[in-house]
Amino acid sequence: MSIPPVIFLPIFFYSSFVQAFNAPECIDKGQYFASFMELENEPVILPCPQINTISSGYNILDILWEKRGADNDRIIPIDNGSNMLILNPTQSDSGIYICITKNETYCDMMSLNLTIVSVSESNIDLISYTQIVNERTTGEMVCPNINAFIASNVNADIIWSGHRRLRNKRLRQRTPGIITIEDVRKNDAGYYTCVLKYTYGDKTYDVTRIVKLEVRDRMIPPTMQLPDGVVTSIGSNLTIACRVSLRPPTTDADVFWISNGMYYEEDDEDGDGRISVANKIYTTDKRRVITSRLKINPVKEEDATTFTCMAFTIPSISKTVTISIT
């Protein structure tokens, strides 16, 4: 009887075979909610999106990056793989990138959409970051989407340009990447450019961000007229008027009354209908006035308390009246 030959597999081959056989199936978590639009020929950093959602008890052994349907030779893993870097991207680097995290028992992956565009006036709105400040206030303009580049470098070199208002003393860069604007004016609106100097290896690259600054109309706070106190008697019919004046751009407010945790609104009577609210509105070219009348009929001893007239708007305002009974 012949003895079948014994086949000895190299240890490394056997180990690889077992690992491949036992490798967990990778869970596809879909595409990250945010898309990335970056400039051609400037460094791009993409984050591994599922890193921040992984529980503390999960031990990651490997973080891998790949581009769907293409070679991965343009991808540079950085920060222990939690981010990926492309140094000189071209429009051909646009596409879907996948971050894979795994250990011996678990694997998941999530994709990100990257679009590389050139700098031109025709697509400036596509690549700019809109920021909003209010007229006649102190506002801030921030160089956006640069945290991954500066990391622990709190003294990053960031230069602003592109708008003549940067020469005005009201605009000051007190913190790297942040412009403080004192007494914001309408003509502060426009496009601003900030450039970060990023060093990788022995070479320095420009990272450019364009901010589209919008200035909202000056917010004029509403005014309210309400007496500090009123004197009445039990059994009488009492009406207290609260007058709210609004100026553009604020043209609407929800006006109601509060007392001892109870809310009194128009068309909403209390249990016995003794306390009610009626609102009247009139409008002119320059303002809108809401007169809210709190009606108590008849007055009872329990009404000797405070009632607050509240105008819910931006910004909100309130005043309180005290009812005294003689």
Curated annotation (Swiss-Prot):
Residue positions the entry lists as glycosylated: N80, N103, N113, N237
Protein keywords: Disulfide bond, Early protein, Glycoprotein, Host-virus interaction, Immunoglobulin domain, Repeat, Secreted, Signal, Viral immunoevasion
Domain Ig-like C2-type: 24-115, 122-208, 221-322
Position of the signal peptide: 1-18
GO CC terms in record: extracellular region
Superkingdom assignment: Viruses
Keyword Disulfide bond attached: yes
InterPro entries: Ig-like_dom (IPR007110), Ig-like_dom_sf (IPR036179), Ig-like_fold (IPR013783), Ig_sub (IPR003599), Ig_sub2 (IPR003598), IL-1-bd (IPR004078), IL-1_rcpt_fam (IPR015621), IL-1_rcpt_I/II-typ (IPR004074)
Disulfide bond residue pairs: C48-C99, C143-C194, C242-C309
MF-aspect GO terms: interleukin-1 binding; interleukin-1 receptor activity
Any one of the GO BP annotations: symbiont-mediated perturbation of host process
Localization, UniProt: Secreted
Keyword match Glycoprotein: yes
Stored Pfam families: ig
SUPFAM superfamilies: Immunoglobulin
Description of how the protein assembles with itself and partners: Interacts with mouse Il1b.
Task performed by this protein: May reduce the host inflammatory response by interacting with inteleukin-1 beta (Il1b) and thus decreasing the association between IL1B and its cellular receptor.
Similarity comment text for this entry: Belongs to the interleukin-1 receptor family.
Protein name: Interleukin-1-binding protein
Lineage: Viruses, Varidnaviria, Bamfordvirae, Nucleocytoviricota, Pokkesviricetes
